[in-house]
Regions:
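Transmembrane beta-barrel architecture of outer-membrane proteins
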Residues: 13-21, 54-60, 97-101, 152-158, ...
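Signature of Gram-negative outer-membrane beta-barrel scaffolds
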Residues: 1-69, 80-88, 172
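Surface-exposed extracellular loop regions of Gram-negative outer-membrane beta-barrel proteins
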Residues: 62-106, 111-146
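Short beta-strand segments enriched in hydrophobic/aromatic residues
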Residues: 26, 38, 65, 77, ...
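Transmembrane beta-barrel outer-membrane domains
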Residues: 9-15, 48-54, 93-97, 108, ...
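Gram-negative outer-membrane beta-barrel transporters
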Residues: 28-29, 145-176
Length: 176
């Protein structure tokens, strides 16, 4: 009889990224922001390896209403490796998806006080969901399954203030 292999093993995760972004004035007061991040991710275990390469683009438009107020719309794709495992002990594939945001920003006192109010929608695939059962051969580690079609939407508010040059405060609130 052989006992199940323990998941307490020497796993190694490698991640390398490269990104670039630019902001272009299309016609004052309209600005275009474009960017991309390339990520190379690999996990090596005693029993298998998994590698994923992904480019996550970003695009945004900013319209300056006046010196203090601007409105914006943005899009970015999502690529987020995760550490959860399935019932066979293998790591789940990275979370992928899209993020959409529309907002209003203000800037006061030479940027010593800024605010942001935004609405957002996040669409994700491969999101880990607990199966409620342990992985066979583990020390009770819970198994997860990847779920597609997860959607989050809501509104967020952020307030940033520089009380002094060395003391800055941030307040943020999000409602899903």
């Amino acid at each position: 009889d052989r006992s199940p292999q323990s998941l307490a093993q020497d796993d190694t995760t490698h991640m390398k990224s490269l990104y670039a972004a630019t902001r272009v004035t299309l016609a004052d007061p309209l600005h275009l922001i474009l960017g991309a991040r390339y990520t190379k991710w690999r996990v090596d275990t005693l029993t298998y390896s998994m590698e994923k390469n992904h480019t996550t683009p970003y695009a945004g438009l900013v319209f300056d209403i006046n010196d203090n107020w601007s409105t914006y719309a943005s899009y970015t794709s999502i690529f987020q490796p995760q550490n959860d495992r399935d019932s066979s002990g293998k790591y789940l594939a990275p979370i992928t998806g899209n993020n959409y945001e529309l907002g209003l920003k203000s800037d006061w006192m030479n940027s010593r006080l800024t605010t942001t109010l935004a609405i957002f929608r996040i669409e994700q695939d491969n999101v880990a969901q607990s199966t409620g059962t342990p992985i066979p051969g583990s020390n009770g580690e819970t198994a997860y399954k990847a779920v597609d079609g997860t959607v989050s939407k809501g509104v967020e508010f952020e307030l940033n203030g520089a009380i002094t040059d060395n003391w800055q405060l941030t307040f943020g609130a999000t409602r899903y």
